[in-house]
Amino acid sequence: DFKEVATKYKEEIISLGGSIKYNSKVVDFQNLLDSKKLIFENGDSIAGDIIISVAGLYGDVLAKILKINIEKKQILPFRGEYYLLKPEFQYLVKGLIYPVPNPNLPFLGVHFTRLIDGSVEAGPNAVLSCAREGYNWKTWNFSELYESISYPGFQKFILNYPLITTGELLRSLSKTIFVESL
């Protein structure tokens, strides 16, 4: 239960005198004598000797603001899609069921997971998002999509694995194809 874990972290950070900023875009960074300071888009700032940033899909953007040399690396926003098994078939899955991995891409493969509430999900696939925060086909950001598809690492990947990338795309566009691949 990720929400509960995050809530506990929040409580512990606050109890130790820390503070948390939500939905705050970092625009600048200052290295002070005894601390570090982040400046946010709205003019607010936060300083401390330890700053933990949960930048997620914007980690590479933040690294550039912090002047961290990440060379020619960037985050590619892939999303994973899941489907719930119908209740009458959930009894078939007692725990985790994983496919035999492809040695070239051992992280890839739809699997079955029994959730805490007893339901069973199948997933994820892996498909390039059309925006950094594009969790479905309705969300597009053309500049972010261009940034992803023009990245040489992405181009190399799709050229090296055309069948796999096409299969993942088809599973995303068609529930029938997704289910048949299970």
Segments (PLM) and residue ranges:
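Flavin-dependent oxidoreductases
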Residues: 29-140
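A conserved beta-strand/loop element that lines the FAD pocket in flavoprotein oxidoreductases
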Residues: 14-26
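FAD-binding core/adjacent interface of flavoenzyme oxidoreductases
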Residues: 4, 10-11, 15, 41-43, ...
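Flavin-binding catalytic cores
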Residues: 69, 89-90, 115-119, 125-182
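Exposed beta-strand and adjacent loop surfaces of beta-rich binding modules
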Residues: 23, 35, 166
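Conserved active-site and cofactor/substrate-binding residues in soluble primary-metabolism enzymes
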Residues: 4, 27, 107, 120, ...
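Short beta-strand to alpha-helix junction loop
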Residues: 1-12, 21, 167-178
